[in-house]
Amino acid sequence: MSFRREKFIEFGGPDGGNGGNGGSVIFVASSAVNTLLYFRYNQHIRAENGKAGSGKGKFGAAGRNRVVEVPVGTQLYDEDGNTLIADLNNIGQQYTVAAGGRGGIGNAQYKSSTNRAPTYFTYGTLGEEHCVLLKLKIVSDVGIIGMPNAGKSSLLSRCTASKTKVSDYPFTTLEPHLGVAYANGCELVLADIPGLIENASSGAGLGHKFLKHIERCVILLHLVDCSLPDIVSAYELVRQELKLHSQELAGKQEVVILNKCDLLSEGEVREKQKLLESSTKKEVITLSMGDELDSLIVFLHAQVKKAVVTEPSDTSFDPFLYVHYNKK
């Protein structure tokens, strides 16, 4: 509230200006970041307050928005983690997490023919304050799936420069790993998904935690260990878990590879290849440790281009993190 006070002006009248609106907290999906690590150390995010109005009818400046870049594939849930608020799938997509408050109204705005000197004004409103849960799903061109010890991490390491842990025991991979493969001008992002076991769709093994990451892959690369006594059952077990998780996941395009063929004779490999092709009704590729992979990368790149790409492939795995956003 303010009144004009100048020499020789007896009845200056009200001249209090309005306050500025507060800034908002806005999330923008960006390819410049690929983890949620920033929020581990910045759990409270505030935008700038609006400035107060002043005399001579001066309006206060609006507060600057706080724009925070997040990886493509970031999902925002309510505090309980049950309700999806926003899904930032595309570069440049944005969501206002907490809107800024409205500025107050100065007494000059209440001047009228019946009230030439109003002595009242309106306070501004508080900005929004929210506590949300961030989740990040892997987004890749090719998701490498299969049972534990099928050779997924070894294949990723050979195709890319990804330094994933490789050992001869189940569940060596405890979190998804990404790698970028290059061959003959083709670029491909591959994700090594931890092995799936029976009842993975119900949370057994590492299932529940990582089945959701496969949803963001364009196509699936299904590895089957050639040395297993029953390769058909091994293949069908993984397929069944995909179906139980979601029909959308089970309907993704799939390339089947019979891996570790160097452990068997050529005759045994051909026999198992025919058996698996007969069961899956798909062409099965055989792969040994010493095989060159450029042709495989080019082939997978062509399959990705044919598939309907609905999501970008430019992010990485990160644990779920609680982040508290507020602006007052």
From Swiss-Prot:
Entry keyword annotation includes Nucleotide-binding: yes
Pfam family, one: GTP1_OBG
Record keyword Cytoplasm present: yes
Gene3D superfamilies: GTP1/OBG domain, P-loop containing nucleotide triphosphate hydrolases
Binding site for Mg(2+): S153, T173
InterPro entries, per the entry: G_OBG (IPR031167), GTP-bd (IPR006073), GTP-bd_Obg/CgtA (IPR014100), GTP1-OBG_CS (IPR006074), GTP1_OBG_dom (IPR006169), GTP1_OBG_dom_sf (IPR036726), OBG_GTPase (IPR045086), P-loop_NTPase (IPR027417)
GO terms, molecular function: GTP binding; GTPase activity; magnesium ion binding
Gene Ontology BP term (one): ribosome biogenesis
Key words, A-Z: Cytoplasm, GTP-binding, Hydrolase, Magnesium, Metal-binding, Nucleotide-binding
Entry GO CC: cytoplasm
Cofactor(s) of this protein: Mg(2+)
Obg domain span: 1-139
Binding of GTP, residues: 146-153, 171-175, 192-195, 259-262, 290-292
OBG-type G domain boundaries: 140-309
Record localization: Cytoplasm
EC code(s) of this entry: 3.6.5.-
Entry function: An essential GTPase which binds GTP, GDP and possibly (p)ppGpp with moderate affinity, with high nucleotide exchange rates and a fairly low GTP hydrolysis rate. Plays a role in control of the cell cycle, stress response, ribosome biogenesis and in those bacteria that undergo differentiation, in morphogenesis control.
PANTHER family hit by this protein: DEVELOPMENTALLY REGULATED GTP-BINDING PROTEIN-RELATED, MITOCHONDRIAL RIBOSOME-ASSOCIATED GTPASE 2
Subunit description: Monomer.
NCBIfam families assigned: Obg_CgtA, PRK12299.1
Family according to the record: Belongs to the TRAFAC class OBG-HflX-like GTPase superfamily. OBG GTPase family.
Protein's name according to its UniProt entry: GTPase Obg 2
Lineage: Bacteria, Pseudomonadati, Pseudomonadota, Alphaproteobacteria, Rickettsiales
